[in-house]
């Protein structure tokens, strides 16, 4: 079967910031309009399913920073517009019992521009005008090896027009134990590209930022009891990261990449369904 659907959403709002009682602000007003639309075509069959989707998001902002008592009104107002559009496709298929293979592709284009409009003359003083593209392809494979063991592995290749290409692998094993218990072990890589704001906008901006990266190791145990009414779990994790984006804490501030970071811990959860 096939399914086609779409949606459109447009929102506009005006906002005013009066400041505090001690330090009131005058004319600190914002006019914000944002819109989003998407279109998707899905397919569902006995051994395969997938979807092709397109999206477009945009925004328009007009902001008066206002002034304090005793100061002069702003002579120019901040303006900006931004957009993000893209396409996403995936198809998942089962070739034999206990198997699931998924392949997919993502593309997105994003960016925007900002400027200050001089009230007296209408002159437009340019600020930031940046556009970026990101392409990604991925494969995910899941296989039930037998009744008590499942394997999950995947890799994603991401190319960003500013920072280049990154490989993101992940893999895990799930042990299906007696009495509705399960033990999972997983290792995965994650990363985050710096945003246009972090690289190009306002005082901390730094165009030389590198993407944040981390590797996560996780071991978890869970079980269901009392006819699945009671659920509890325990999770151990260790994360090793690099290049976390942060402010250097100086004046003027500057966004920088940190050195290595480590984080580890234990999480526990429990739930009970009464009816």
Where are these regions (language model features)?
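Outer-membrane beta-barrel translocator domains and adjoining extracellular loop/strand segments
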Residues: 8-11, 16-25, 54, 62-72, ...
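Outer-membrane beta-barrel transmembrane domain signature of Gram-negative proteins
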Residues: 31-33, 44, 56, 69-152
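Transmembrane beta-barrel strand/turn architecture of Gram-negative outer membrane proteins
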Residues: 1-8, 37-42, 49, 82-93, ...
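Flexible loop and strand-edge segments within Gram-negative outer membrane beta-barrel domains
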Residues: 3-51, 56-84
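Repeated loop/turn-to-beta-strand initiation elements of outer-membrane beta-barrel proteins
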Residues: 2-6, 14, 45-51, 98-101, ...
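Structural signature of outer-membrane beta-barrel domains
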Residues: 11-16, 34, 46, 57-63, ...
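Outer-membrane beta-barrel signature, preferentially recognizing the C-terminal barrel domain
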Residues: 22-44, 80, 130-132, 176, ...
């Amino acid at each position: 079967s096939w399914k086609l659907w779409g949606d459109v959403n447009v929102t506009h709002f005006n906002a005013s910031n009066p400041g505090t009682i001690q330090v009131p602000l005058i004319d600190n007003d914002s006019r914000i309009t944002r819109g989003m639309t998407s279109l998707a075509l899905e397919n569902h069959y006995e051994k395969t399913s997938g979807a092709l989707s397109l999206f477009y998001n945009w925004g328009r902002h007009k902001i008066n920073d206002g002034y304090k008592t005793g100061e002069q009104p702003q002579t120019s107002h901040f303006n900006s517009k931004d957009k993000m559009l893209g396409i996403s496709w995936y198809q998942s298929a089962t070739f034999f019992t206990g198997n699931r293979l998924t392949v997919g592709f993502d593309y997105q284009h994003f960016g925007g521009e900002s400027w200050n409009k001089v009230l007296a003359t209408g002159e437009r003083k340019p600020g930031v005008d940046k556009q970026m593209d990101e392409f990604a392809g991925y494969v995910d494979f899941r296989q039930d090896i037998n009744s008590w063991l499942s394997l999950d592995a995947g890799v994603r290749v991401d190319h960003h027009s500013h920072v280049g290409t990154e490989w993101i692998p992940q893999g895990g094993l799930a042990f299906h134990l007696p009495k509705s218990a399960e033990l999972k072990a997983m290792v995965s890589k994650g990363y985050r590209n710096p945003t246009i704001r972090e690289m190009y906008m306002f005082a901390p901006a730094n165009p030389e930022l590198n993407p944040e990266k981390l590797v996560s190791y996780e071991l978890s145990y869970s079980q269901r009891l009392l006819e699945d009414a009671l659920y509890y779990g325990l999770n151990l994790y260790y994360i090793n990261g690099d290049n976390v984006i942060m402010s250097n804490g100086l004046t003027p501030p500057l966004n920088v990449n940190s050195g290595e970071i480590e984080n580890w811990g234990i999480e526990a959860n429990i739930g009970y369904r009464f009816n």
